[in-house]
């Protein structure tokens, strides 16, 4: 099922797979991807970790920044990448 971006991030937070309409933002339940860049992961304790590609010097793209923003809402840990 093709979902809205905020729902993709929510499904990652629930450890479920999901994808948006064109596959540019997706989760396999463990990792969260913006295009082919892994922006989120799940550690051995089940904590959701988001890599902050919006920070100064680590900016990737406008779209990836939006995807990171959605992921932050469901992350336990935010890493400055």
Report the location of each language-model feature.
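Terminal leader/tail segments of proteins
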Residues: 1-81
């Amino acid at each position: 099922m093709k979902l809205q971006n905020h729902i993709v991030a929510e499904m990652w937070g629930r450890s479920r797979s999901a994808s948006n309409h064109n596959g540019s933002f997706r989760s396999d339940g463990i990792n969260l991807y913006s295009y082919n860049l892994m922006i989120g992961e799940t550690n051995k304790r089940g904590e959701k970790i988001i890599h902050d590609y919006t920070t100064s010097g680590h900016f990737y793209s406008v779209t990836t920044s939006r995807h990171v923003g959605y992921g932050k809402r469901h992350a336990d840990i935010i890493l400055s990448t």
